[in-house]
A protein has these predicted regions:
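Transmembrane-helix bundle segments that line or gate the permeation/cavity pathway
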Residues: 1-185
Length: 185
């Protein structure tokens, strides 16, 4: 039998700087479309979403660990929650984000990006507040970036050993296999 180190699944504490950066990110995603209705060619919202959040942060997470959790724009309010049990809500919200990206007409439109992120922000925080869910159970972007960070390329321990430990720790969350399949698909 192999005894492996078990770590805390997730800690959602943010520094003041992280919260301020998260507010800035949320503002840059929502304001250009909702407040000023900028065109997609001149707006920063599509750049923030498609280049920074979908590509840049996961690549940085592969190198430096879970940096998205440090400034998560959906984690602005402190909410007491239970220990993470499942990620089914995150799976459903991830399907919604994927539908927005692949099916919805004009996913690069700043107004559409603003509306989607306002809905995501409200959904995540209502689930956290009323159902006492932990952030990693309901935030699909956090779970996505967290999974990428668990594949971290730079480790002080042997790579495959730490990768197996990380995967073993994640297996305790019900529904994680569905989220991984959605992520791959």
């Amino acid at each position: 039998s192999i005894i492996s180190h078990r770590e805390e699944i997730f800690n959602d504490k943010q520094s003041l700087f992280g919260k301020l950066f998260g507010i800035l990110i949320l503002f840059l995603l929502v304001a250009p479309g909702v407040i000023s209705n900028e065109s997609a060619k001149t707006s920063i919202a599509p750049l923030m979403l498609w280049v920074f959040l979908w590509i840049g942060v996961p690549v940085l997470g592969l190198l430096f660990g879970d940096i998205y959790a440090k400034f998560n724009p959906l984690n602005l309010f402190p909410v007491s929650s239970n220990k993470p049990q499942s990620v089914y809500f995150a799976c459903v919200l991830f399907i919604g984000l994927t539908w927005f990206e692949l099916v919805w007409r004009k996913p690069g439109n700043p107004l559409n990006i603003g509306v989607v992120f306002m809905l995501l922000f409200i959904s995540v925080n209502l689930l956290r507040y009323f159902l006492k869910k932990s952030l990693i159970e309901v935030d699909p972007l956090l779970l996505l970036h967290y999974l990428y960070s668990k594949l971290k390329l730079i480790n002080s321990r042997p790579y495959f050993r730490s990768l197996l430990d990380n995967i073993g720790n994640l297996a305790r969350l019900r529904g994680i296999e569905y989220f991984v399949l959605l992520m791959i698909g």
